[in-house]
């Protein structure tokens, strides 16, 4: 079972990681191509392109300028410990045991605009480059065209290594658009999380992001290996709804918080 998640805009490079064990991203040469494009952007260009404040644009211009591919554990951090956001709050990587961390490294993949597809222990430098950014580059007009089939092929390779052809998509639509579902060599399962509000069950972004992280952690903790086992997910008050589920979209409900 391979789990796909999105990265986070919120980063933590202050707190030391739980382990010195690390790996290197597979697509650093591609990352360097993108960095070279980004290094030509002014802070004003970045503010317009990414729709961010001048302060954030200036910070990211500096990050692009300082980025070098030969970074190490001394000035970088493993992705699973660097990303902080709702998904990662739900996943709570800081409480993983060494055995759970090993399973996470094997089963979890993080889609990234800059790095393509990350393993949890892959070292990253601070950056902001969302997958939906319309960054013109040598391969096209945006990052979806830049990555092309590369990430789909990488997911298929990871699935083949697992020997289990279940792919659990817990990524956002923005990031999963970088994958070509029809070319995936496995069964794609996309869980849906709905909370009760104003008289109906609906997807509430903040809660859904946390739930995706909690489900990813549940899969690791419980060593889930089948869809039936996935349906037993019951963290934080969620429960499986057969009535609202579709064959490849199991739906989980939660009452008003």
Swiss-Prot record:
One of its GO terms (biological process) is response to hydroperoxide. InterPro entries: YaaA. GO terms for cellular component: cytosol. Disulfide bonds: none annotated. It comes from the Bacteria. Coiled coil: none annotated. Belongs to the UPF0246 family. PANTHER family: PEROXIDE STRESS RESISTANCE PROTEIN YAAA, PEROXIDE STRESS RESPONSE PROTEIN YAAA. HAMAP family: UPF0246. This is UPF0246 protein Shewmr7_3045. It comes from Shewanella sp. (strain MR-7).
């Amino acid at each position: 079972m391979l789990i796909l998640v999105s990265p986070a805009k919120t980063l933590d490079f202050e707190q030391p990681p739980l382990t010195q064990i690390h790996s290197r991203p597979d697509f650093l040469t591609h990352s360097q191509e993108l960095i070279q494009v980004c290094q030509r952007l002014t802070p004003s260009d970045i503010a317009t392109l990414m729709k961010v404040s001048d302060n954030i644009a200036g910070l990211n211009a500096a990050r692009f300028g300082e980025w070098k591919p030969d970074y190490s554990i001394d000035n970088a951090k493993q992705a699973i410990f660097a990303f902080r956001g709702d998904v990662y709050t739900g996943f709570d990587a800081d409480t993983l045991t060494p055995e759970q961390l090993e399973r996470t490294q094997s089963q979890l993949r993080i889609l990234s605009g800059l790095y393509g597809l990350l393993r949890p222990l892959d070292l990253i430098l601070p950056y902001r480059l969302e997958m939906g950014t319309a960054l013109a580059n040598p391969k096209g007009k945006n990052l979806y065209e830049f990555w092309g089939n590369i990430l789909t092929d990488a997911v298929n390779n990871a699935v083949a290594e697992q020997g289990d052809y279940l792919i659990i998509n817990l990524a956002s639509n923005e990031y999963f658009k970088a994958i070509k579902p029809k070319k995936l060599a496995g069964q794609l399962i996309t869980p849906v999380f709905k909370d009760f509000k104003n008289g109906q069950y609906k997807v509430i972004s903040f809660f859904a992001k946390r739930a995706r992280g909690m489900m990813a952690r549940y899969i690791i903790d419980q060593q889930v290996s089948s869809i039936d086992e996935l349906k037993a997910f019951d963290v934080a008050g969620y429960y499986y709804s057969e009535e609202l589920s579709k064959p490849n979209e199991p739906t989980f409900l939660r009452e008003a918080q």
